[in-house]
């Protein structure tokens, strides 16, 4: 281990505890795009003159697509309950959870709330490490905070910042607003 001084030791300990309870969530939505007929671009006289009449005129048929999503979640029940953001799992056909120990599980969506952007999912596992909830009413502007997640699918990433504001409202994100604002780096895939 590196010796960066005593000041960093609490952050190392907190990071270890938090990372054990933060999971990577991969989601898939399957859909079929219907045929839309021939593309008018290929029927353009200039295009036909350049490529010739023998250019194959195809009518695209239905195609299957897989839309993939990434996010993070926090284990809140040792029996497999995980809290994430609603937008991570909303409308998805498959949700897969990867634990820090590299085990993967198919997850079941238990409940979602689009207004607060919160969702609960469950995996079939037991004896999982649980991250305890804090008391947001005790937070103060200027306190240091850590954010743990899977930005861009890079698992177990920890960033640090301070609490910039508490009780933030009127930002137009969701109907219910009482946000904690931080300057800790939050990237796509950290949601959850």
Residue ranges and their predicted role:
Residues 1-192:
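Serine-dependent protease modules
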